[in-house]
A protein has these predicted regions:
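Beta-strand-turn-beta hairpins that frame and shape the catalytic cleft
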Residues: 4-9, 42-46, 143-151, 168-173
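Conserved beta-strand hairpin/beta-sheet module of binuclear metal-dependent hydrolase folds
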Residues: 13-73, 77, 163-177
Length: 187
């Protein structure tokens, strides 16, 4: 793949939240809420966008009843070694998007405004959003992760929500995180 080509992008189903059903118009019924992450297969190394629900928090387990796929298993299913992941971009720090970031040793990109919001009580599961030392890459606004992959600030769902734009050739894909929520039929 040359720099000009579009990297392959694959979706990971990281959890299904049983206690928060969403309407599925094609089936005319409520269905469990899926939690997705993404892998951008970039020549500089895989980039993970969102890491799903964490494992082992009794409050989250009791309230939301998630069926969680360990991030390492989801990556393995796509042929990605967790040790090869070059970067993580978290769309935001709610529990269902940042929960398994600690399973990876690479840099984690988060908006400064999101990081600040996550330090307040009841914003997230603190231990799941705890990113320490050199791994934490605070971003102010738009930024490049690596050539052809950039972060775009998309506040709204949270103060520091961010999306990822992947470009290659004449194509552009936006991994919107949760700045746009469509029904299950569109996911």
């Amino acid at each position: 793949m040359t720099r000009a080509e579009m990297p392959r992008i694959e979706r990971m189903l990281l959890a299904v939240i049983e206690a928060v059903p969403v309407w599925h118009p094609a089936h005319a019924t409520f269905e469990p809420f899926p939690v997705f992450g993404w892998v951008v297969h970039h020549p500089d190394g895989p980039i993970v966008v969102d890491t799903g629900v964490g494992i082992g928090n009794s409050a989250i387990d009791g309230w939301y009843q998630p069926r969680v796929t360990p991030l390492a298993d989801a990556l393995d299913a796509l042929g990605v070694d967790p040790g090869d992941v070059a970067a993580v971009v978290l769309s935001h720090l709610h529990f269902d998007h940042c929960g398994q970031q600690a399973a990876l040793a690479c840099p984690v990109h988060v908006q400064v405004t999101e990081w600040s919001a996550a330090q307040t009580e009841h914003y997230t599961v603190p231990e799941w959003a705890d990113i320490r030392g050199e791994r934490l890459r605070l971003v102010e606004g738009d930024a490049e992760v690596t050539p052809g992959v950039r972060i775009v600030a998309t506040p709204g769902h949270t103060p520091g929500h961010q999306s990822v734009v992947v470009e290659g050739g004449d194509r552009r894909v936006v991994l919107a995180g949760q700045c746009v929520f469509l029904s299950l039929i569109h996911i």
